């Protein structure tokens, strides 16, 4: 499957470069397109030209690229246009070893496959406490029972209220609410001024401390915590105190937008509004794969096929912009006038 996806990606990327007839083509592009177009035309009875000039020729090349993307993704989209019929025989062209794939395309596909077969720490986009079901007001002392109490202020900040002379461990408070956290990077600080339950202003006692695995860490210093070593807090003073913990970032074994290179800009390109026709075509392809058709997913993709699909569809968007095909999609009405922000916003809603 890697070879088929790499060949499709190589052909689609090569087609981006052929729109200017005055430019000499790269030898690698000529070899790739020469073989790919011959195989495609022979199997599908199409007549794609290597140097498309007319609108019909540009349409034919874009349809070939669409066929190759769909074949690589094993997607059949059915009747979506009076001008385009998917050529199911395209997979036969991609399966042949005659079509070369370029180094970058194969590296991209192999990187995706390799990364999705294993796990590694990557930076998480959401805050560690985004899954908390309740929060509390910052700087408001609240210990209904016992001598210490911790709570969440927002998705990145937690606070610990302590009576005079109190101490305790805060591992459960600081650990993320979901996922397999590897390392958490936080800073802690005492709240200089806070309010008691009646609203009176109080000052934290001097000498409050935090230890990680028995080692004192200074307020304001970045602490790298593995979520296992004990994190203890103490208030040896004679007054109540509040300590604030701010998580700067943390890493997890969960998939992220850094799992493979350039995943974030690839998603942006996939879901960018190029035209009503492209907007509909992209939606149909993703719907057939049970992926988000209009807006990017809430969480980063977790499956190899999803990431390969994003890479191929983003490249198909580049070809669409380069070739400027003109064809109809069922149910799509061409907008009147220029595309503007209001029209695009309406398309996403």
Curated annotation (Swiss-Prot):
InterPro entries: Capsid_hemagglutn, Orbi_VP7_capsid, Orbi_VP7_capsid_C, Orbi_VP7_capsid_N, Virus_capsid_a-hlx_vir
Keyword vocabulary terms for this entry: Capsid protein, Glycoprotein, Outer capsid protein, Virion
Residues with attached carbohydrate: 45
Gene3D superfamilies: 2.60.120.170, Bluetongue Virus 10, subunit 1, domain 1, Bluetongue Virus 10, subunit 1, domain 3
Top-level lineage group: Viruses
Biological processes annotated in GO: fusion of virus membrane with host plasma membrane
A GO term for molecular function: host cell surface receptor binding
GO cellular component, one term: viral outer capsid
Subcellular location field: Virion
Family per similarity comment: Belongs to the orbivirus VP7 family.
Quaternary assembly: Homotrimer.
Function field: Major structural core protein; binds to structural protein VP3. Constitutes the surface of the AHSV core.
Name of protein: Core protein VP7
């Amino acid at each position: 499957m890697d070879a088929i996806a790499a060949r499709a990606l190589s052909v689609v990327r090569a087609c981006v470069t052929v729109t200017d007839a005055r430019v000499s083509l790269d030898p690698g592009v000529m070899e790739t397109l020469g073989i790919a177009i011959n195989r495609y035309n022979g199997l599908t009875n199409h007549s794609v030209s290597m140097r498309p000039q007319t609108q019909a020729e540009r349409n034919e090349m874009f349809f070939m690229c669409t066929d190759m993307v769909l074949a690589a993704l094993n997607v059949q989209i059915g009747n979506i246009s009076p001008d385009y019929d998917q050529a199911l025989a395209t997979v036969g062209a991609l399966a042949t070893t005659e079509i070369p794939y370029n180094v970058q395309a194969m590296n991209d596909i192999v990187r995706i496959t390799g990364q999705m077969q294993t796990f590694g720490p990557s930076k998480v986009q959401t805050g560690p406490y985004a899954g908390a079901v309740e929060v509390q007001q910052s700087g408001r002392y609240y210990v209904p029972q016992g001598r210490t109490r911790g709570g969440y202020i927002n998705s990145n900040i937690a606070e610990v209220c302590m009576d005079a002379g109190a101490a305790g461990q805060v591992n459960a408070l600081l650990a993320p609410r979901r996922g397999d956290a590897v390392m958490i990077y936080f800073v802690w600080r005492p709240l200089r001024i806070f309010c008691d339950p009646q609203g009176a202003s109080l000052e934290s006692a001097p000498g409050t401390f935090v230890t990680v695995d028995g080692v004192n860490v200074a307020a304001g210093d970045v602490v790298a915590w593995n979520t296992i070593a004990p994190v203890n807090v103490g208030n040896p003073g004679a007054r109540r105190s509040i300590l604030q913990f701010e998580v700067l970032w943390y890493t997890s074994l969960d998939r992220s937008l850094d799992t493979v290179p350039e995943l974030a800009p690839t998603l942006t390109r996939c879901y960018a509004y190029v035209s009503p026709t492209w907007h509909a075509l992209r939606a149909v392809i993703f719907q057939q794969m049970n992926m988000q058709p209009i807006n990017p997913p809430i969480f980063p993709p977790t499956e190899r096929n999803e990431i390969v699909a994003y890479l191929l569809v983003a490249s198909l968007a580049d070809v669409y912009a380069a070739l400027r095909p003109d064809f109809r999609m069922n149910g799509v009405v061409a907008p009147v006038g220029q595309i503007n922000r209001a029209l695009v916003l309406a398309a996403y809603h």
